[in-house]
Structure formats: C-alpha cells, structure tokens
A protein has these predicted regions:
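Residue(s) in the substrate-gating loop at a strand-loop-helix junction
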Residues: 525
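Active-site loop-to-helix junction immediately N-terminal to the catalytic Tyr of the SDR YXXXK motif
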Residues: 479, 531-539, 551
C-alpha cells in the first residue's frame, strides 16, 4: 500500500534525527475512512516496518469520545485503554497510547514528535504569549493536560472550538510541556510544516547552545564507583555513565543553574529520568562522597526508589540505569532536558511540570517503559576489563562473557582489531555493552586512563581479567636480553601495575557495599605450573605471575577482593600458536624444542599427545573457569589448570 510506504518513509526520516526523537518518543499514523495505522508500542520510528504499526477500527475508536468513564483517574485510563485495545485489529500489536489523538485529527497523515527546539518554547514561562507572537492563529495551542484520555478529550474539544472559529481544522497543534502534532494530506506537506515551525522558533532563540565537550575530572575514579554502590544496595548492580560537556558544565556550576533542570519538562522526561534529581556541589573526594551518601539516602527514603540523575559540580552528569542501555536512555533524555531549559530562557525562562502533574506521570502505568530489569546471565551487569581482548584468548573470553550479560572493556593496543571485536560484542549484547579502550599495560598512565574510561562508561569495575601477554621461545644460547626483558615487562610487571590500579576501584566499591566482591583473574599458562624447555623466559614470567597472585590474594582478601590465576593449556586455534610467521608452532619448530619434528604438523601432533584428552584449550573452557572463580567466595590465591589433564596438581 503506497500510503503505508510513505508513512514508513517519514517515520524513519524523523526517527533517525535526534533533533526530533529522543528515546523513541513520538508516533506517526495514516488513516482512511475506516482504519487507522498508528505506531505500535515497542517499535522505534527509526527502523520501523509495516509490522510496527497497529491497525485500528475507527468506528470502534470513536466510542471512546462519547463513553462515560470512571472519575478515578487510574480507573478511567484503564477503561479507555481497554476500549482502545478492543478497537485494535492487529491483536499482537499494542497501539500507541496517543492513538486516539491521531484519530481526532481528520488529516490522513499525522506526525507527533517531541522536538527539542519546539519543547524549548512549549516548556517556557511565556509559552502562550510567545506562541501567539510567533505563529498567530496559524496553530492551535493547548495548555498542559495529563497524558492519556484526559489529553485526548482536551485536544478534541480544542479542535472543535478552533473549527467553530476558523471553519477548518488546524494543521499544527502545540501542546504545553509535551510536543507537537502535525497533520496533512501528504508527507511532503508535513515536512514543509515542520521546517517552517522549527525555522521560526530557531530565529527567536537569543543565545545559542554551548557547544563542545568538557574535561571530566580525574576525581571521577575516586567518587563514582562508591556512588554506584550507594545505588546498588538491593543486591542488583547498577550501571552508571558519566558525561561532561560545555552545556552540562553550565548547569552543574551552581545550585541556581541546576534549579533550571531540577524537574521534568514533559511526561517522557519524568518517565525515563524520574521526577527528581540530585545536585552535589562539594569539591573534594570526601566531601562529595559524604554529600552523595546523605542525598541518595534521603532520595530513597522520600521516593521509594533510586535516583537516575546525579549532577556533580566539577565532574559532570552521572546517569544511573539497571543496565547500560537504560543508562544511555537516561543520558539522552536528561541532556535533551538541558537543551530545552536553555532554549526556554529565550521565552521568559523554563516552566517545568507542576508537582501534581509529576505525580500523575509517576503513577501512569500505561506509558511507563518496560525496561528489562535483570537478565539471566551469570554475570549480568557486572563490569569487566579484559586486557588483550582484541583477538585470541581475550576475544574469546570477552565473547563468552558478553553472552552472560557482562559489560566489557576491550583493552588493547590494536585499535583496528579492537574496534572490530567491540562491534562484534555489541551485536551480541542485549542491555549490556562493550567499549574499546586503547591501553599499554606496561605504562601506569595508560592504565590510569583505562580505569577512568571504564568508570565513565559503566560506573566502576567488578572483574579485571589480566589476559594480555606475549611468548618468545628460545634457549639459553638464542634468547636475547631484549626479548627476555620484553616478556618480563608484559607478562609479569604489567600484572602488578594492573592489579594496583584495579584493586583501588574495588576497595572503594566494597567500602560502600558490605555484600560486594571484586575479582582479579590472571590468565596464566600451564607453563606457570612446570618448566618449559627452550621457553624459560615465558615460563619464568608465568611462574612469577602465580607468585604475585598468591601474594596479592593475601593482601586483598580483607577487602573482599579475590585474586586467582587460570592456567590454560594450549589454544591451538589462536594466533599465539597458529600465526604462520610468529606462532609458537613455528617458533618451537625453529627452536628445535620438539625432537625429530620436521614440520608444524609434527609439533602440533606432539603437543596433542601430551594431553590425556588429546585436545587443546578453547576460550569457552577458560570462560567457564572465569565464571566459577567469580561465583565462588571460598577460594583465593589459586592457580586453576585448564589443560585437558596435561598438567595435574599434586
């Protein structure tokens, strides 16, 4: 059907433009005399297909306008929703809660959005006078109404009055603290109307938005992990995201500026970000933590739930979510609120929703987003850093963990390969997420930046997997001092540097949550359990790693941080062994490590014969060990072999 194709076209056009759609807000429709196609709940405008539209019987919908409902607002909304669902022909698709508003306008195509610029006007003190000044009687302005049935009836009555006065319906309806409806015969007309409305408002803005990023203070690593624990004391870990910009910095610089964004401007902002937010003005670590703990406890006590938005002077915007996806939505919506507040200054100042209006939205079940709270992954919402995760064992471990609900930081020097791996991980993720962080694990400053990136992306650190390592085979005659020192630096020294940095975050978290545990897991080797001929430099670095593991475990146990090593057998399919130029099969052949071996296949057969199970070790095997070590709370300082029986502990 041509009209539905056009509806999809215009839906995607605006849905993919963040100036018009934030967090999936807004909806579109097409109607003929008998039926209405309207965006179904749970479908994004940006990617919508024909299956994303609910189809309704307009005759049955019209009953809603004349039927008498309960005077109790909750009961009334439930009754009206029931009638709306009864009109739905496509029973598997729930129509938008605003479907009745689309039906109230007679134009075939309707596009309802919440554009930032328009809501700067709609959420201003002088909204009615300024709307009249800018548009005259070209548009229909409707003062705020609670969403749902009440809004539908108010708009219907306003349309009827407009028709009585003007002799025709309005093409544009502007809703206070809500957004805009545009109706027309064609999608081209709708596009032209939107362009005209936005251009008119844009020319009335007296000061442009502050542009550009702003630095996030290094204090973030000493503050935000503790705040994460303050909002995670119910046994379910939260994800936090930290962002800063010139715009955020302006609103965070004082209580006066924060007050301009201290309440929601629309139902959506109240739904996604809650109706109240926290501002912290302290400027030292101890003072910030003290103020945060006090205000978060007060917030929970008075509201019955955790805050989703915390603005910290000198640090930036901290968003709280049940997973990384929700955190990103909270960030998008609150940043949009900041822009709305800024634009509103051109129209007399900001006008947030009243306490009574917020209360209705807080209790409005019909439109509350059904976020996935907790998945069934074994490490759901835990935060991992995996070094050397761009490829090989690290990549395999990261892929296993992302399937189990983990948030992953791919820490590696290889930016190109790391970016590819991170993209693959995110395609596998659901509510969780992966990011790439370029890191040189032998450089303390690079590790410090890695920790900061992790805290900003996810709010803290639960598990550090020290996986990055190198192997250079050689006997006493052929091993160079340069190769020996390089292996020691990467396989041994870096483990110390990473543990030092990671344990600081874990100590801080556990100080604020008595039930929390942290894990540091070194991916060692079977060569860390027994000597390796013509491979002493590698084996020595791995033996030393187990010594560090045991010593770190003794030191960190009082802080509820477990430290363990995993000693995998040979990962024959990975680049460490199978690289045709520098792989260990080639190195061992050239070093004469396997007596009588004349080819790479001879070397491989020799190593397979060393394992009773005649198999190499795969990342999935190692990941099972990682999960075991995390889930248990009775072992630390251990070296767990995963070798198919090749190495057996005494």
């Amino acid at each position: 059907m041509k009209q539905i194709e056009q509806l999809i076209e215009i839906s995607r056009k605006y849905g993919q433009d963040s100036r018009f759609v934030i967090a999936g807000g807004g909806n579109t429709s097409y109607k003929d005399d008998e039926r209405l196609w309207v965006k179904a709940s749970g479908h994004a405008l940006a990617t919508i297909t024909e299956d994303g539209f609910a189809v309704l019987d307009r005759e049955k919908m019209n009953i809603i306008s004349t039927k008498q409902y309960s005077t109790n607002s909750s009961e009334r909304e439930a009754e009206a929703t029931e009638d709306l669902m009864a009109a739905c022909i496509t029973k598997g698709r729930k129509p938008s809660v605003e479907a009745s508003l689309h039906n109230a306008m007679s134009a075939p195509f309707i596009v309802h959005l919440h554009p930032t610029l328009i809501n700067g006007l709609m959420s201003s003190v002088d909204v009615e006078a300024q709307t009249s000044r800018l548009f005259g009687d070209e548009v229909l302005y409707v003062p705020y109404s609670d969403p749902g049935y009440a809004l539908y009836m108010k708009v219907s009555q306003a349309i009827a009055q407009y028709v009585a006065n003007k002799g025709h319906e309005p093409q544009v309806i502007l809703l206070q603290n809500h957004g805009i409806f545009v109706g027309a015969d064609t999608i081209q007309e709708i596009e032209a109307i939107y362009d005209r409305v936005l251009s008119t408002i844009e020319h009335a803005i007296s000061a442009p938005l502050p542009e550009g990023e702003a630095e996030i203070s290094d204090l973030v690593s000493e503050v935000v992990p503790a705040i994460r624990m303050m909002v995670s004391r119910d046994g379910e870990s939260r994800t936090l995201k930290v962002q800063n910009s010139q715009l955020i910095e302006w609103f965070a610089q004082s209580q006066e500026h924060f007050d301009k964004v201290s309440g929601p401007f629309s139902p959506d902002s109240g739904i996604y970000c809650n109706s109240k937010y926290i501002y912290i003005s302290a400027d030292s670590v101890d003072a910030i933590l003290s103020e945060a703990e006090q205000k978060i406890e007060e917030y929970k006590s008075s509201n019955g739930y955790d805050p989703k938005v915390i603005l910290i002077k000198g640090i930036g915007l901290v968003c709280v979510g049940r997973n990384a996806k929700e955190c990103g939505i909270v960030e998008d919506v609150y940043l949009d609120m900041m822009k709305i507040a800024w634009y509103a200054q051109s129209f007399g100042g900001e006008h947030p929703m009243t306490p009574e209006q917020r209360l209705f939205v807080d209790n409005w079940e019909a439109h509350r987003p059904k976020f996935k709270t907790a998945g069934n992954g074994r490490v759901e919402n835990k935060i991992f850093i995996v070094t050397g995760a761009a490829q090989g064992f690290g990549e395999g471990i990261a892929k296993c963990l992302i399937r189990e609900g983990a948030n992953i930081v791919v820490a590696d020097l290889n930016e190109e390969r790391g970016g590819i791996t991170t993209a693959e991980l995110n395609r596998m993720a659901s509510g969780n997420k992966a990011i790439f962080a370029k890191c040189n694990i032998t450089d303390p400053e690079s590790i410090k930046a890695l920790i900061k990136s992790t805290v900003c992306a996810f709010g803290g650190l639960d598990v550090f997997v020290s996986n990055a390592g190198i192997a250079r085979a050689g006997d006493l005659e052929t091993m160079s001092i340069e190769n020996f020192e390089l292996m020691t630096k990467i396989n041994y020294n870096a483990y110390f540097l990473c543990t030092k940095a990671a344990s600081r975050v874990m100590k801080l978290q556990n100080r604020y949550n008595a039930e929390n545990w942290g894990d540091i897991i070194q991916i060692n080797s079977k060569s860390g359990l027994r000597g390796s001929k013509a491979n002493f430099a590698y084996a020595g670095s791995k033996f030393g790693g187990i010594g560090l593991t045991q010593s770190f475990a003794l030191e960190l146990a009082p802080y509820r941080i477990k430290v363990n090593s995993i000693c995998p057998g040979n990962f024959y399919d990975g680049p460490l062994w199978s690289d045709p130029v520098n792989g260990l099969f080639v190195q061992y052949l050239n070093a004469g490590k396997v007596p009588g071996a004349k080819s790479v296949e001879d070397v491989k057969e020799y190593y397979l014969s060393q394992s009773p199970m005649r198999k190499g070790c795969a990342p999935a095997d190692v990941c099972k060990a990682v999960l075991y070590l995390i889930e248990q709370t009775c072992e630390t300082g251990q070296a767990l072999p995963i070798t198919g029986g090749q190495t057996m502990l005494n």
